[in-house]
UniProtKB/Swiss-Prot annotation:
Quaternary state and interactors: Interacts with CBF5, NAF1 and NHP2. The interaction with NAF1 and SHQ1 does not occur when NAF1 is associated with the chromatin.
InterPro entries: CS_dom, HSP20-like_chaperone, Shq1, SHQ1-like_CS, Shq1_C
GO CC aspect terms: cytoplasm; cytosol; nucleoplasm; nucleus
Annotated localization: Nucleus
Record-annotated CS domain positions: 1-91
Source species: Saccharomyces cerevisiae (strain ATCC 204508 / S288c) (Baker's yeast)
Keyword line: Nucleus
Gene Ontology molecular function terms on file: unfolded protein binding
Family: Belongs to the SHQ1 family.
UniProt xrefs under Pfam families: SHQ1, SHQ1-like_CS
GO biological process, one term: box H/ACA snoRNP assembly
Record carries keyword Nucleus: yes
Protein name per its UniProtKB record: Protein SHQ1
SUPFAM superfamilies: HSP20-like chaperones (SSF49764)
Length: 507
């Protein structure tokens, strides 16, 4: 059976469903339309469509179905059971196509009335395009909606084993294998794992941390820092960092404009998806049901994906280029290292997993933020801490915009990878399912909670938290490198000290 394309509109009394049935000879005899409670079932071989609506319909004499030969479509009109009832999310085809049970509990979240009070406003005054946006959130309201979601990592027995022979699973909910190794032979240089098919989750974290340290160039970072702080106008113009720090991506501008005009900014931002976005949801996303045991890694993956997207938009000033997918892939650890665990854990004798002392005191969200910054200081052209923090602030705005604004960003990301001849594999192993799952089962409350926690962790972050293992010297006898741990603030202090010394003692 083929799922046809469709579009839906409504008025106070009716739902109007347009079903496209191109390239077949229409026969009214073979047409079957069933209306049952909140469901419409359409069948005309080889097409089959089953839609579930948020509210109930009624099949009476007012319902009609007419074939339009010019547009090759069938126009179905069905009455609402309750007149003037508004049907939500009619422009989310993936959600309408979901099977019974897929949506159950998607927005359920137990409120925690004893949640801690946040001490800082979630949005502070930020300069955007020269306009001061004084944005203040109702922290108590957001806390009640979101703080009930527990972002702590659960300690449990590790049921998976990897002896170096068995393939490991990766991607969305660890459903995939084999795909990435095939793509590397076709030129997939986003992948950084030496052996993606036989590296387990914890070893991916270890390999990622090691390679981030090797990739980070202290001299490059310090040069960018000194240019930004002490460079003249010509240096800043050549470097471009000054203009990038002023840039705001279009999707963030949409939120800020809505927030400025809104009479109740604590609500989620209303989004009407374009025809192109609706077509993308119908044609390019899988129609699956998902039974995910642990949804926290999926929301943290969305966090990292959004950061990579926003940073790429800033870096390219809002225009996707041939390098956009590469940039986003490199900045996102769940893509470049297939790393959805993020935290390194140690194996104990009883088989339990213990969080490594390196990041034991950090939450998963804080590690996601730090990882994004570390990678933003290692891979792109502009490696600037303020730029990375600005990107995280913009991620917060997208999350505060609500589920539909996040969907808009995910659709843009998905499309960028879909059009690439090699990198499209990351749609297949992650972004296809992640986007479809979030459309059908993503929760406004959890997104609000994620925004709250992300903002809290970001505000508590400092340059001292961004550490790298750097080569200090080489052993004279063995020639092996000797390493030392430095945070980026220490690097800046050393560079400024050397700069002042040069200014005082010019050659």
């Amino acid at each position: 059976m083929i799922t046809p394309r469709f579009s839906i509109t409504q008025d106070e009394e009716f739902i109007f469903l347009k079903i496209f049935i191109s390239n077949i000879r229409f026969s009214a005899v073979g047409l079957e339309i069933i209306i049952q409670e909140n469901m419409i079932i359409f069948h005309l071989s080889p097409y089959y469509l089953r839609l579930r609506f948020p509210h109930e319909l009624i099949d009476d004499e007012r319902s009609t179905a007419q074939y339009d030969s010019k547009d090759e479509c069938i126009n179905v009109k069905v009455a609402k059971l309750n007149k003037n009832e508004y049907f939500e999310d009619l422009d989310l085809p993936t959600k309408l196509l979901a099977r019974q049970g897929d949506l159950a509990g998607a927005d359920a979240l137990t409120e925690n009335t004893d949640a801690k009070k946040t001490q800082k406003p979630l949005i502070q005054e930020v300069e955007t395009d020269g306009v001061s946006n004084n944005i203040k959130d109702d922290v108590k309201t957001i806390g009640q909606m979101g703080e009930g979601f527990n972002w702590e990592i659960e300690q449990k027995m590790d049921s998976s084993t990897n002896n170096g022979i068995l393939k490991t699973k990766y991607g969305f909910d660890n459903l995939y294998d084999t795909v990435i190794s095939v793509s590397t032979s076709n030129g997939n240089d986003i992948n950084e794992l030496d052996d993606p098919e036989h590296t387990d989750a914890n070893d991916r974290v270890i390999e990622r941390l090691r390679k981030e340290n090797l990739k980070f160039d202290p001299e490059y970072y310090v040069s960018e820092y000194m240019t930004h702080k002490y460079g003249n106008e010509e240096d800043l113009e050549i470097n471009g960092i000054k203009e990038l720090l002023k840039f705001t991506p279009s999707i963030v501008k949409q939120y800020l404009q809505w927030y400025k005009d809104s009479t109740n900014p604590n609500l989620v931002m209303p989004i009407e998806f374009t025809d192109e976005e609706q077509k993308q949801m119908q044609d390019n996303l899988p129609k699956k049901s998902y039974l995910v045991e642990d949804i926290k890694p999926l929301y943290v993956t969305i966090l990292s994906v959004l950061f990579s997207y926003v940073f790429e938009q800033i870096e390219n000033e809002g225009t996707h280029t041939t390098e956009s997918a590469w940039t986003m892939g490199k900045l996102c650890p769940q893509i470049s290292f297939l790393d959805q665990q993020l935290k390194q854990v140690n194996e104990l004798q009883d088989g339990m997993k213990e969080i490594s002392k390196v990041n034991k005191d950090s939450s998963l969200i804080k590690i996601a933020i730090i990882t994004g910054i570390r990678r933003a200081l290692s891979y792109p052209l502009h490696r600037n801490y303020d730029l990375a923090m600005k990107a995280w602030t913009f991620v917060y705005y997208i999350l505060r915009g609500g589920k539909r604004l996040v969907i808009r960003a995910l659709l843009d990301i998905h499309e960028t990878f879909r059009f690439h001849d090699v990198y499209y594999v990351y749609d297949k192993v992650l972004l296809d399912d992640l986007t479809a799952w979030f459309i059908s089962q993503g929760s406004e409350n959890v997104i609000r909670s994620l925004a709250l926690e992300m903002r809290k962790e970001q505000e508590s972050l400092s340059k001292q938290d961004i550490e790298f293992e750097c080569i200090a010297s080489f052993n004279e006898q063995t020639g092996e490198p000797e390493w030392e741990t430095l945070n980026i603030r220490e690097m800046e202090i050393l560079a400024e000290s050397e700069y002042r010394e040069q200014q005082q003692n010019p050659q």
